[in-house]
Amino acid sequence: YLHSFLNERCVTYSKHISKPEESRKSCSRISPYLTYGNVSMKQVYQATVKAAQEATYKRPLHFFTARLHWHCHFIQKFESECRMEFENLNRGFDVIRTEVNEEYLKAWKNGITGVPLIDACMRCVTQTGYLNFRMRSMLASFLTHHLWQPWQAGATHLAKQFLDYEPGIHYSQFQMQSGTTGINTVRIYNPYKQGRDQDPAGVFIKRWVPELADVSSDDVHAPHEMPALFAQM
């Protein structure tokens, strides 16, 4: 995976990193191997630096190197504040989102919320163990902002789906997306806009939500907005 990424697939890394379908080929896909220690961060970093020196496509490799820096940063941060697995980093948020709506949570976990991209992402990660970064962030944001559920209610479930589960990255990112760090900008992803931006033809959605396979690309992102006549056809 590392060899094919550095020599071929990385060319479209920067362009496709946020797209749920294309990222499956354009991202490195080495995260599970880093998680389980099959390859070390030092090996990956040194190989990337060497490839960047020799390649004509330097920009995507520099972009990837920055992500490696982030990886190390968040793991080190977790070592310093391991309580973030259970507690809000900013305790001022302890008084909000205290109740769990089991119906909402079940729909989110099973990919049956009725929001196409959300459901496609959850079904995909449940079956394959992989999802690109932006879509992971969107799942966390949707749970905590749109469904208004405490992040703790969904963090463990999502962690169990990942082949590359890394506590240091997972919990810090989940808190960032839920807005409980107290220092990061609150991120609220519009799942309909994300679908149109990152999966415009609806390829990813139709693959994982076959119920929408026959819906046009124009309507697949928000089928609830279809005129009643077309929805019945």
Over which residues does each language-model region extend?
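Long hydrophobic alpha-helical segments that form multi-pass transmembrane helix bundles
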Residues: Y1-Y13
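C-terminal catalytic domain of photolyase/cryptochrome flavoproteins
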Residues: V11-M233
